[in-house]
Amino acid sequence: MNTKVKGYVLAAISAATYGMNPLFALPLYEGGMDLYSVLFFRYMFAIPILAVMLKIRRRDFSIQRADVMPLIILGVLFALSSITLFSSYNYMDAGIASTILFIYPIIVALIMFIFFKEKISKKTMACIAVALLGIVLLCNSGEGAVVSTKGVLFVFGSALSYSLYIVFVNKSRIGKMATIKLTMYVLAVGWIIFAAKALISGQLYTPSPEQWYLWINVLALTIFPTIISLICTTEAIQCIGSTPTAILGVLEPVTAVFFGVLVFDEVMTPRIVVGLILVIVSVTLVVAGGHTGKLLLRLRKMFPVKVNKRTGQQDNK
């Protein structure tokens, strides 16, 4: 297998595995776990795996004092993005939620335009309008589909939080930190938030030995949409660069919709199909359009990736 083919395959695997989030999260809800318990264990299992990966790559664990506050801010943004995304699954079909979440590159482009005075092309403006039309269709998706205003607001909150996370990382000194190290500390901050919430509320759902199948879902939620997605993303960027990898991120919502329909009996109406196509095409055009694609170096919802700005190759693994 040549390098380019390998890169495209890995990018597709990365996006598809991230799209498995609902596949493993929804059974945990059905088994009695609340979203904070799900995220508590997901973060808790991911942190040591990242630490091992960091050690294998012979990276140090030290941080400077000036990095502490940015890491706390990023940890809060990341935790908020996770909370709102996983909350949305309680109020709408997971496939629709994952598709609306996919608009975060457009939100990043708007943030860069409004706050950093970066030019926004007519093509990007047209894509934004098309994406909004797609979202309107998804929110009025027809008989049988589960969509609520509360769910849509949660997804928008998740997309906005993650967009702010991306911009903060790329516009601050913290962006120079090794990717895995940064992610590990960000998740550590998030885990502290979830642990504090559990202590204050006195509520943390821990599956019993009889509920072994829930532990399998927790581990799968950690391994597939997180660790495998991270590894495949870093390798894909090395092989084909950041923009093609970002474009293949289109498989994230497609995978979520596929499992939603196949496993959870979510409804697929003509409006949903048209809405999906409009959102996916508009976002793909924005990502392929230059600087926004370069800015979205940290692609995965769980584990972003850093790329050398000059070469387009993965850096500081």
Can you describe what each PLM-predicted range is?
Residues 5-10, 36-52, 127-130, 150-157, ...:
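Hydrophobic alpha-helical transmembrane segments of multi-pass integral membrane proteins
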Residues 37-48, 78, 86-119, 124, ...:
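Specific alpha-helical transmembrane segments that line the substrate/conduction pathway
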Residues 50, 72, 111, 120-140, ...:
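Hydrophobic transmembrane alpha-helices of multi-pass small-molecule transport proteins
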Residues 13-20, 24, 53, 72-91, ...:
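Hydrophobic alpha-helical transmembrane segments of multi-pass membrane transport proteins
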Residues 1-37, 41, 80, 84, ...:
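Glycine-/small-residue-enriched transmembrane alpha-helix faces in small-molecule transporters
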Residues 31-32, 91, 117-119, 175-176, ...:
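Helix-loop interface residues and adjacent transmembrane-helix termini in multi-pass membrane transporters
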Residues 39, 43, 140-141, 214, ...:
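C-terminal-most transmembrane helix of multi-pass membrane proteins
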Residues 24, 46-64, 132-146, 189-214, ...:
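Membrane-interface helix-cap regions at the ends of transmembrane helices
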